[in-house]
Amino acid sequence: MAIEGAPVGWMQDWSAVGSGKNAHIGVLLVHGFTGAPPSMRPWGEFLHSKGYTVRVPLLPGHGSTPEDLNEVKWQEWPAKVIHELNELKKTCDTIFLIGLSMGGGTVLNVATTNNEEIKGLILVNPWIHLKGVTVEVSFLVSRFRKMRASVGNDIKRPGITEWGYDATPMRGVYQALKMLRITRKNLAAVTVPVQLFHSVEDHTLPVSNTEIILAEIGSKDKTRIELVNSYHVATLDYDQELIFQNSLTFIEGLTP
């Protein structure tokens, strides 16, 4: 079923032009699988309040119905991010990419081929593999089962929703795993500084995702920050302020 009750105007691309000395610095924030811009927009608004130019796109197949996500090819997700990156380049000479969950995997994919255009990456509970599930297995499952129970809204803080789908499209999972397998093979090509936030208690993705990325990425400057009071969608959880402030410090440290 379609998403109901989401804030008006939030289930679409959002952007804001920066001001002052930070206006030339762009930040692109990408939501996760079955999620939507509401999971990243508060972060984007925080960074915009500090003068940065920000863009929070809606990935193809999201923000409408789960059935739409079953019709998307994985190449559409990095293509959307690259489009947004090019939009930022029109006014910004320094750009950071931020990704939550599959959004993290997507910005990593983009960084493997656009490394020189990116100043740094910030990842929150990024997805790079699905333990025990191969691309081939997910393909077979998707042929016989279109949907499964939702994996979204893994938030510790009561009364908070990420406004995502109430079901998991299995063909979409297959496409995501295809993208992530290719991304993982090329992680060594990513050499920009990386800040990675990881929830100690994550009911959606195992810690192996964080460990794989930190072990296989080509970046020498990589920092891991543990979140002890948030679940998977940490950008909306109790550690939100910690994420916001540390990301600001990371960006400021690379743009003196």
Task: Give residue spans per PLM region.
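Gly/Ala-rich beta-loop-alpha elbow adjacent to hydrolase catalytic centers
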Residues: 99-103, 107
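Short beta-strand/loop motif that positions the catalytic acidic residue
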Residues: 190, 196-198, 202
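Active-site nucleophile loop of the alpha/beta-hydrolase fold
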Residues: 122-132
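Conserved alpha/beta-hydrolase "acid-adjacent" motif
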Residues: 203-209
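Catalytic nucleophile-loop/oxyanion-hole region of alpha/beta-hydrolase
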Residues: 65-91, 96
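Catalytic histidine neighborhood in serine/cysteine hydrolases
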Residues: 211, 215-233
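Catalytic active-site module of serine/aspartate enzymes centered on a nucleophile-bearing elbow/loop
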Residues: 228-256
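Short, surface-exposed "cap/lid" segments of acyl-processing enzymes
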Residues: 6-65
